[in-house]
Amino acid sequence: MLEIVYQDEYLVAVNKPAGMLVHRSWLDKHETEFVMQTLRDQIGQHVFPLHRLDRPTSGVLVFALSSQIASEVMPMFANHEMEKTYHAIVRGWIEEANVLDYPLKEELDKIADKFAKQDKEAQSAVTAYRPLAKVELPIATGKFATTRYCLMEMQPKTGRKHQLRRHMAHLRHPIVGDTTHGDGVHNRLFREHFSAQRLMLHASELRFMHPYTQQPLVIRAGLDEVWQGLLSEFGWQESLLINA
């Protein structure tokens, strides 16, 4: 059963669990559970995704309730006429808010993009970010006697594939749990010490003008047990007041 965080006659939004594919994909031919099919069965009607959320990322995911609504609303999402807010735990301490303007080359999949042009120019990619809290743990990693982590709030201003994960890695502050762009030592530390098996990236909030009511709409998704446990462990509850 998916948690529905918003629904009206046009749109429905869920809190996507980490690790769940949005729809059937060649990425995992053996997977049997998908957000689209689960939500369709749950509400008894077809749904049409308006944007994407990577498999390991949790949080707000919005669907249209008809193909016509999807065709009318999708340009708004494609043109980034909304404000997305994510939260993440990253390696190291970031001391101040900033905006990273760092172009990214398109990441191509070996199978799905086999015939795509391989030498495309990097595309504009902009991310606003700010640190919310820090922690220093008495756990040695490499030559360091302690390890430092930071709770981050991020707002992507463009929509490149894996943008937040790649931008944080570029800053040398990879997101914990990122098996592609992250740091295996710290991913393993979180698995072994905190039973955190997931990517610590959550799509917390989506703000946009409702395409039919023309009223501002704010959709929020709460944090799962892994996130809640880490906030408690690190004393970060007051830094990130999102309802579970």
From Swiss-Prot:
Keywords: Isomerase, tRNA processing. It catalyses: uridine(65) in tRNA = pseudouridine(65) in tRNA. Its EC number is 5.4.99.26. One of its GO terms (molecular function) is RNA binding. One of its GO terms (biological process) is tRNA processing. The keyword tRNA processing applies. It is an enzyme of class 5 (isomerase). It comes from the Bacteria. InterPro entries: PsdUridine_synth_cat_dom_sf, PsdUridine_synth_RluA-like_CS, PsdUridine_synth_RsuA/RluA, RluA_PseudoU_synthase. Pfam families: PseudoU_synth_2 (PF00849). The active site is at 54. Responsible for synthesis of pseudouridine from uracil-65 in transfer RNAs. Belongs to the pseudouridine synthase RluA family. This is tRNA pseudouridine synthase C.
